[in-house]
Amino acid sequence: MKGAPDFSIFNHMDSRQVMNRVEAIIETHKTGLLATVDEEGKPHIRWLTPAVLRDRPGAIYAITAGRFAKVAQVKSHPQVEWMFQTPSLDEVVSVRGAINVVENPSLRAEVLEVIGPRLRTFWKLAHDTRDLAVLETVVEHATRFLPMEGRKEVVHF
């Protein structure tokens, strides 16, 4: 493509460093985009409020209601992608991995403790706390894109 920038790919970051960047973006901006695929192979993308838990490296967590469509989607097609970005778009991190629907009460409590206060919109839609499930994305691959520097970092976990 004529005039397209030639982004250099660097592999200087390791999995811990890229997850630290994901955590920093989440802590500052509170949201990320989750892309899933439905039973017909059609893509769906939505904003969620995720968290990175220090005791559980290499994973991204979110809360959902068991009746929401994304639960059926990830059970049928567990490969997903998250995107995190700064408001100025000077840093964009995309993370791919396999997602699990976890119904472990202690993990649910741990995730809720971290992100529960940030879930105002979610609580309007999910009325029954007994229906909550944890989405655990086990990260397999990440790309950190710094468009203003023409730089891309690729990390395999």
Which residues does each PLM region occupy?
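Charged, gly/pro-rich active-site loop segments
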Residues: 2-14, 94-157
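Short, basic, glycine/proline-bearing loop/turn elements
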Residues: 4-8, 36, 48-59
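Short, basic/aromatic recognition patches
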Residues: 7-31
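A short, Trp-centered hydrophobic/proline-enriched beta-strand micro-motif
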Residues: 24-40, 80-84
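A generic structural signal for short beta-strands and their flanking turns/coil linkers
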Residues: 30, 46, 56-58, 76-80, ...
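Histidine- and/or cysteine-centered catalytic micro-motif in compact active-site loops
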Residues: 37-39, 65-67, 85-87, 96-100
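A short mixed-secondary-structure module that forms the rim of ligand-binding clefts
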Residues: 51-89
